[in-house]
Swiss-Prot record:
Organism of this sequence: Corynebacterium glutamicum (strain ATCC 13032 / DSM 20300 / JCM 1318 / BCRC 11384 / CCUG 27702 / LMG 3730 / NBRC 12168 / NCIMB 10025 / NRRL B-2784 / 534)
Alphabetically ordered keywords of this record: Signal
Protein name: Uncharacterized protein Cgl2664/cg2949
Chain segments annotated as coiled-coil in the UniProt record: none
Keyword Signal on entry: yes
Cell division as UniProt keyword: no
Length: 194
C-alpha cells in the first residue's frame, strides 16, 4: 500500500480563514475612501483658474488668479459671466484680494450671455479683440504687499446679486516662448546639452 499524504482539516481551515481575512481587509480598506463624505471631497486644489458662482448662479466667475509681473505689478485675472435667465444685466461693484481693494478700469454692466474678462494691462494687450460676441476687457491693478508665487489668497467679488468669495492662486504670467533663457545649474546644465 502506498502512503498518501493526507492534509489535516486544521490546515485547510487556517488557509480558508486567512483568505477570508485578506479579502475582508482589502474590501474594508478600499471602501474607506470610496464615499463622497470625506475630509477632502469638498476641497478644491490650489491651481490656476479657480471658479465659483453667486446664489442661484446668475453670475459666475471663472479662471480666477492673482497675477504678478516680473516687475512686481499685481492684478486679478478672471472672467465674469452673466447667465441670468431673466435677461437682467448685472454690475461688478468691487473686487478685493485678501482685504485689499482692486482697481478696475471702467467696468460696464454685464448684459445677459456676456462676459467681462479682466487681467493686468500688459496681459490684456496680448489679447485680440473679438469681432463677434459680447466681451468687455477690463484692466485690474492691486497693491502688491509681497504676494508669493504659488500662494493662495482669498478674492471677493461683489456684484449687485451678492458676494462671491473664492481662494485664488498667485501666479506669474506665462512667459513668451523662446524669449527667456533659464539657466539651470550653471555650467553643468550647459555641458549636459552638448
Amino acid at each position: 500500500m502506498e502512503d498518501e499524504s493526507v492534509k489535516s482539516l486544521n490546515l485547510a481551515a487556517r488557509r480558508g480563514a486567512l483568505v477570508t481575512v485578506a479579502a475582508a481587509s482589502a474590501l474594508a480598506l478600499a471602501s474607506c475612501s470610496a464615499g463622497q463624505i470625506t475630509q477632502t471631497s469638498s476641497q478644491v486644489a490650489a491651481v490656476d483658474g479657480n471658479q465659483a458662482g453667486s446664489a442661484n448662479d446668475p453670475v459666475l466667475v471663472r479662471d480666477v488668479t492673482v497675477h504678478l509681473t516680473t516687475d512686481g505689478e499685481a492684478g486679478v485675472k478672471f472672467t465674469a459671466i452673466n447667465q441670468d435667465t431673466s435677461h437682467t444685466s448685472h454690475t461688478l461693484e468691487s473686487v478685493t484680494v485678501d482685504g485689499e481693494e482692486v482697481e478696475l478700469d471702467d467696468a460696464e454692466p454685464i448684459e445677459r450671455n456676456c462676459s467681462l474678462v479682466a487681467d493686468i494691462q500688459s496681459e490684456l494687450d496680448l489679447i485680440e479683440e473679438p469681432e463677434v460676441g459680447c466681451i468687455q476687457h477690463v484692466a485690474t491693478s492691486l497693491e502688491n504687499p509681497g504676494f508669493a508665487y504659488g500662494g493662495v489668497v482669498p478674492v471677493e467679488f461683489v456684484f449687485d446679486t451678492g458676494a462671491i468669495t473664492i481662494d485664488a492662486t498667485v501666479s506669474a504670467p506665462v512667459l513668451e516662448s523662446g524669449v527667456e533663457n533659464r539657466e539651470v545649474g550653471g555650467d553643468t546644465a550647459e555641458a549636459s546639452h552638448h
